[in-house]
């Protein structure tokens, strides 16, 4: 008896989508996914359109032909198919990570173009075990958040859900399913290239590991992650726990912080460092422990710079402070019709007809701007503006947001951006992200 498409896919609610993107490389995992998904969608009264998307990474001479063969197979079975190519220059280092980033960028764009609410991938139980072993080797200890491995659901770019419905299905079960259906697959030779981390783990430690034991460790790590997340969600429900000013400086109540467990404290302060620095990831385990020790008074320094964030310990009941350090702040062009993220902290939309440059103001030009506009801002507020975006027009400082009653160009809108959540949000962290956004908000207020 084969695998049950209904049991596999029903929990994901795919039926509410207009279209579903299936990521299909031509390997056994993705082809198994495709045909099981096709069978499931055929059971729905009003099924979404199924679109198979093959990403040609242009890393092997055979890849174009393999993508073409996937298209022929899809045509034979009445499945829409398209090929997207990664045509960018390939990096000398970190190729696998760069390819993964490019792949998801292309898949998200395909989903948006098709109005698809879901991207579905063929990650299997074997991949889950390998992911755990890879992350455990990197972290060196058993309490790392990443040991919860891959979430069955994630949200990409705030708009498209990534579903991994096969995380409890083995690769062999999928191959047996394809064999039963008479469908052949391609074995990508890069999957056996031990120059890459995953094949090295797959052919080494994963081949020798007790799979059931690893899955139990994943469940334990997931439970620990949920406990720390839940502690932060509960703390954030109290408005006194965390505050933020217009420019994004955050104020963490020292007593609330001290009342948390060490693991929850490390998560909380690491998360705020990532938000303040505009980063997509948490600081490493060691850095999070270092921040927690400093804020808890176990280490002497009263301030640290981590991940682009300046963190200051509050004394005598004062709140701990997190803000962007004044280094490596970008300059970006904002043209009509554009939507861009500045420094991982602010999102700009330009529906007007004028072009601007977004950059932090220089100290003297900010002083002159404030003087010419008749404003008197205290020193601490002025420092906040120096790490905030301003608009330049024709090379001249033209608009400074967050000032009371400040003029602002027609059609330009700014809101807060959370890089750590807004690009890839694992399902493990859905509730935590909602709690952070509810407390900090997206709207940008004024500095008075």
From Swiss-Prot:
SUPFAM superfamilies cross-referenced by the UniProt entry: Adenine nucleotide alpha hydrolases-like (SSF52402)
Highest taxon, organism lineage: Bacteria
Pfam families named in the record: ATP_bind_3
Main localization (coarse): cytoplasm
Summary of the function given for this chain in its UniProt record: Ligates lysine onto the cytidine present at position 34 of the AUA codon-specific tRNA(Ile) that contains the anticodon CAU, in an ATP-dependent manner. Cytidine is converted to lysidine, thus changing the amino acid specificity of the tRNA from methionine to isoleucine.
UniProt xrefs under NCBIfam families: lysidine_TilS_N
Protein name per the record: tRNA(Ile)-lysidine synthase
Organism: Brucella melitensis biotype 2 (strain ATCC 23457)
Gene name as annotated: tilS
